């Protein structure tokens, strides 16, 4: 959807690469961005780690990543240290930290649910680990062993609604309380094909008391 239907809709060139080709040699991905002057490309967080770990200094010297405006990072937890390592490794190739685009989405929502502003710096929050384990969001004054840095996934798309709900009580969470991410909007699928029971449980959640909904239960935690 994001990398095939969108270019067709916009009438712009799109270069495709198989996941196998990337995994065999991560350099191929950045080489393609450099060769074709790509402006938008991305992948899961681990893809950026692979590039840092596998691409040699000699290979880096041949790259020009200055055209890369949106480096989307999603499909799994986005890690602050990965972004910092990648930026440091490829800054001399023209890569800019503000190109990183942490985002959140899933197939059931026709891809994207939230994302940051283009060219905006990723938003980081340093939080207390012990509080997170208790589903509470408490800021840590500085980075240390008992803290954890989380990367924000931007703002909800205008046509979508996100609520954070307690998965046990089905009630809205309080501010600064971790809960399950629920999504509602026109891009949310109607359900799973020929799976009525699973569709009812996943796509038709309602908040207790308010009866607001129907929401898609993502199974992911957020605040």
Labelled PLM ranges:
Residues 3, 28-32, 46-54, 81-89, ...:
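Alpha-helical scaffold elements adjacent to nucleotide-binding pockets in ATP/GTP-utilizing enzyme cores
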Residues 16-22, 36-41, 72-79, 151-153, ...:
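Hydrophobic alpha-helical scaffolding
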Residues 150-163, 167-176, 180-223:
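Conserved ATP-binding/catalytic segment of the ANL
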